[in-house]
Amino acid sequence: MRVGIFGGTFDPIHVGHMIVAEQVMDELGMERVVFVPSGIPPHKEASSVRAPAEDRYEMVLAAIAGNERFSADRIEIDAGRPMHTVETVPLLKERLPGEEWFFITGADEVSNLLSWKDPDRLLEEVVMVAATRPGYDLSRLGHLEARLKNFDRIFPVECTRVDVSATGIRRRILQGKSIRYLVPEGVREIILSRGLYRADARRTRGELLKEERS
């Protein structure tokens, strides 16, 4: 069985994430994709994560509802500390069924793979799927070939381009603009009902790292 792991902050999860997951799953014949929201991301400043981990996890659950081939795992949230992907993957492989494992992320993130912890060891555990937009210049990944012995475990998959980003969604919320159709409807309802990403919510929901570390 082929299983994809889709990690990220999902702050918030949006239609771009859903399209990538569906198209990669279809292209590579995966049985399922497991979404793994980060708890305390090791590569981001604490202040850059806007919504608490529990809210982000519940938004992921809302986004994947109705797709039986999508699931979510809170392994990184429950860890209560920053977890690197190379730590997360072996633990997931122990607790979930699967024979072939893939890690799904954007090509721009893959181009920075040398900054990840133990990238070659990670590539021994999974095939790294670099989701690209149409027309993406694959030579932007070429610098990795001489530095990674497992470079051949990086596999680009072209996905439909949707000009949606979590940053742009948060900006629209701050500006009082609609985010309908940019995120799944269940995600939009959580954001609105909890007042996430509004200017007055930044600190009220958000001594988040202090809360999540305690």
Curated annotation (Swiss-Prot):
It comes from the Bacteria. It catalyses: nicotinate beta-D-ribonucleotide + ATP + H(+) = deamido-NAD(+) + diphosphate. Its EC number is 2.7.7.18. Keywords: ATP-binding, NAD, Nucleotide-binding, Nucleotidyltransferase, Pyridine nucleotide biosynthesis, Transferase. GO terms for biological process: NAD biosynthetic process. Pathway: Cofactor biosynthesis; NAD(+) biosynthesis; deamido-NAD(+) from nicotinate D-ribonucleotide: step 1/1. GO terms for molecular function: ATP binding; nicotinate-nucleotide adenylyltransferase activity. Belongs to the NadD family. Catalyzes the reversible adenylation of nicotinate mononucleotide (NaMN) to nicotinic acid adenine dinucleotide (NaAD). This is Probable nicotinate-nucleotide adenylyltransferase. It comes from Rubrobacter xylanophilus (strain DSM 9941 / JCM 11954 / NBRC 16129 / PRD-1). The lineage of its organism: Bacteria, Bacillati, Actinomycetota, Rubrobacteria, Rubrobacterales. The gene is nadD.
